[in-house]
């Protein structure tokens, strides 16, 4: 599923991401835009053999099990396929675990490069939340 901007913002808010670990909703919507273009079915293979899955491009080396990533830790205890669902609950729950680690949202390269230090509120402007 490809979410609309405000549709995704509303879903993320409902699932408790607004100000989760101090990151406003705009940060999460911005990250999703530049990680997956709001597409829950996005997958991208990495040079180390791992794959990033779903709307927040969660990595199989650490966070989920896809059965083909050597030494996968599966710290979210989920199959990576769960991260491709049109229902973003699994992605959000895993993202909460990721952002609670030492690096915060810097765990997402796209957030670091495209969202951090910008006017992320623009990503939810005009949305009825």
UniProtKB/Swiss-Prot annotation:
PROSITE patterns cross-referenced by the UniProt entry: GLYCOSYL_HYDROL_F22_1, GLYCOSYL_HYDROL_F22_2
Pfam families tied to this protein: Lys (PF00062)
Subcellular location(s) of the protein: Secreted
GO BP terms in the entry: defense response to Gram-negative bacterium; defense response to Gram-positive bacterium; killing of cells of another organism
Key word Repeat present: no
Record-level GO cellular component terms: extracellular region
UniProt gene name: LYZ
Alphabetical UniProt keywords: Antimicrobial, Bacteriolytic enzyme, Disulfide bond, Glycosidase, Hydrolase, Secreted
Organism: Tragopan temminckii
Positions of transmembrane segments: none
UniProt xrefs under Gene3D superfamilies: 1.10.530.10
GO function term, MF aspect, one: lysozyme activity
Protein's name according to its UniProt entry: Lysozyme C
Protein family: Belongs to the glycosyl hydrolase 22 family.
Disulfide-linked positions: 6-127, 30-115, 64-80, 76-94
Subunit structure of this chain's protein: Monomer.
